[in-house]
Amino acid sequence: LYKERASEDYKKVVENALSDARNIEKLSNGLMDLAKASYNTEQISMSAIRLDEVLLDASAMVMKAHSGYNVDLRFEDDTEDDEMVTIRGNDYLLRTAFVNLIENNCKFSSDQSSTVQISFSKHKVLIRFSDTGIGIPEEDMEHLFEPFYRGRNRDFSQGNGIGMALVERIIKLHKGAISVYSHHDKGTVFTLIFDYLQSD
């Protein structure tokens, strides 16, 4: 009985150590990404990229990392027009931002799901990341994009307070806009707006 107990305790210590190591790695990667997103556009490699392809990659990464998460991607028919989903940007940074938004949707929703929709309006491409989760408390909204700020929902899920600050910096680096609408116990919607590339 003692040996079984000792084995269980040892296993728990190892699991906790691995969990701590993963959290430290995630924090370290987040800090490096935050620093990179603070560069100006001349310091970042930019090229023409399709947002729908980056979204597909991001959703696949999230579902591979979290088997219980579900991502529902919804594209308008006009997505077949390459120009309308193409912007000048950095593939890695945008994918990082999209992964953060999708994971946020999933981890704060009881059904662990995120709905991502691409739409278009007057040379703009809009991407909405929505969930039906617990929502963001009103008093936390003004601090949402502050680095290391963790709001009243911090006990609901683990995090380091870097994700939303990183997302905002990446979107601004791409000359985009980000807004958020949230309703208690009904969900949250993050909306990104970018200018798409137009032919000369």
Regions found by a protein language model. Name each.
Residues S19-I24:
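Short alpha-helical segment of the dimerization/phosphotransfer core of two-component systems
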Residues Y39-I44, D82-G89:
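Conserved micro-motifs of the catalytic ATP-binding
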Residues S45-M63:
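A conserved beta-strand-to-alpha-helix junction within the catalytic ATP-binding
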Residues N105-C106:
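Short helix-loop "hinge" at the ATP-lid/N-box region of the Bergerat-fold HATPase_c
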Residues D131:
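Acidic ATP/Mg2+-coordinating residue in the GHKL
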Residues I136-F148:
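Short conserved segment of the HATPase_c
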Residues G176-A177:
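Conserved glycine-rich
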